[in-house]
Amino acid sequence: MTRAFYIGRFQPYHFGHHAVIARIAEEVDELVIGIGSAQKSHEAIDPFTAGERVLMVYNALEHLSIRHYVVPIEDVRYNSIWVHHVVSRTPRFDVVYSNNPLVIQLFREAGFCVKESPLYVRERYSGTEIRRRMIEGEKWEHLVPKPVAEVIKSFDGVSRLKNVSTSDSNFSL
């Protein structure tokens, strides 16, 4: 049995992520999906909480025929210990899929098999672009699986994003 690890911020989860995960699912038996930067929320580039992102991913993958686990992963300030941090919070995995150069480097240095996951129509399926559309009041729902749009609407995520994107709210407490 082969279990893979794939991490993303999923701010929000979109069809690009969905295509990559579907492709990974063809190659492995189980998949651990890490919700990266889990401690971040209520910011312009990270508007959604870890729990909200877990729901987005879980609901979007409900019909995927692969056993999967969705695990929040907080950032650590030291890249040299990040892989150990990830491993300590997830079920064991055999292979890592990523297109992030730092993630690839860190996991390779730690002795993991790493496969690069190509971006899927990046210019269209980008969290940055989807958040921009939300802020500007443009259509965005067609860029995410329906269950993701439903999760975002359930807590009025677009209003939150608009509120935290205003200049007066861009400060840390």
From Swiss-Prot:
The name this protein goes by in its record: Nicotinamide-nucleotide adenylyltransferase
Cellular component terms per the entry's GO annotation: cytoplasm
Database matches in HAMAP family: NMN_adenylyltr (MF_00243)
Domain of life (superkingdom): Archaea
Subcellular localization(s) per the UniProt record: Cytoplasm
Keyword Transferase appears in the UniProt entry: yes
GO terms of biological process kind: NAD biosynthetic process
Family: Belongs to the archaeal NMN adenylyltransferase family.
